[in-house]
Structures are given as C-alpha cells and as structure tokens.
C-alpha cells in the first residue's frame, strides 16, 4: 500500500540519484582530461621585472607559454600567488597569457607554438608582498 502511494516519488528519487552519480562521473572525466592537457602546456621563464607591458613602463610579470599538445588553445588562464615573507599566500590574481577576447593579442596558440607575455602588476600586488610568487596554469579552453 505504501509502495503504491509513494511509487512516483521513489522513481523520481532513483532517477535523481542516478543523475547525480553520472554528473560526478563526467566531472571527474573532464577534470582528468584538463589535467592531462595542462601537462602538455608549459610556462617558462616566469619572472617579475621592470619593463614595458601594454605600453606602460613599470613592474610586470613576464614569461613564455609553450603549447606542446595537439590542440589549438584559445584561452589559457594562469593563477599567480603573491607571497609574504612567511611564505603565506596574500593574494591570487588571474592572468590570461592566451585570450581570444583580448583587443591587443587575440591570436590562439597553435600546437608546438610559443608566445611571450607580460602583464603590469603595480596596481595588483599586496602591500606586504615580499617579491616571491608562484605561477600555475589552471584552465585551458580549446578552439
């Protein structure tokens, strides 16, 4: 009697549980795929220096991104963590060394292609930044 009464609700709950399991499964597959692709893209010679970036003289983060994969990259996201003297992360900022929406350089990064980048950071760095940082690629979007 109870089974007949709540049959539709039970079926709906089972379908909902299956959808959640499938969603988690596909997210893991997508995350693993992204991690494999991130291994094929290299940040090289990332450094802080004084120079001209976007036509402005000042302190900037410079480097090179190298696509060792088979796919054309239209957007690459890089997280830079600015550390204090105790090694604590004081600020995280996103930069886009490859960005198809950029007015300045909207070209994609083709396989076996490298590109130099530079971004001004004078207005970004925290006051207690000691000059150390880490930079990692966190996201890739392919053409």
Question: Where in this protein do the model-derived segments appear?
Answer:
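Membrane engagement elements in two modes
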Residues: 1-60, 115, 133, 143
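Solvent-exposed loop and beta-edge segments used for protein-protein assembly and interaction
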Residues: 55-57, 72, 111, 129
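Hydrophobic residues positioned within well-ordered beta-strands of beta-sheet architectures
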Residues: 59-63, 76-78, 117, 133-138
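Exposed aromatic-hydrophobic patches
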Residues: 62, 104-105, 116-121
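Asparagine-centered strand-capping/turn motif at beta-strand->loop junctions
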Residues: 65-69
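The feature marks short-to-medium sequence segments in extracytoplasmic or secretory-pathway proteins
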Residues: 71-111
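Terminal connector regions
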Residues: 111-143
């Amino acid at each position: 009697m109870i089974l007949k009464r709540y049959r539709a609700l039970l079926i709906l709950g089972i379908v909902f549980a299956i959808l959640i399991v499938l969603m988690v499964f596909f997210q893991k597959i997508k995350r693993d795929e992204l991690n494999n692709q991130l291994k094929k893209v290299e940040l090289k010679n990332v450094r802080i220096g004084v120079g001209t970036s976007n036509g402005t003289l000042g302190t900037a983060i410079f480097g090179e991104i190298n696509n060792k994969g088979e796919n054309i990259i239209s957007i690459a996201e890089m997280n830079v963590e600015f550390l204090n003297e105790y090694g604590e992360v004081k600020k995280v900022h996103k930069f886009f060394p490859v960005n198809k929406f950029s007015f300045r350089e909207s070209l994609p990064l083709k396989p076996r292609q490298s590109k130099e980048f530079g971004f001004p950071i004078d207005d970004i760095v925290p006051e207690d930044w000691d000059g150390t940082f880490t930079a990692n690629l966190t996201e890739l979007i392919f053409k």
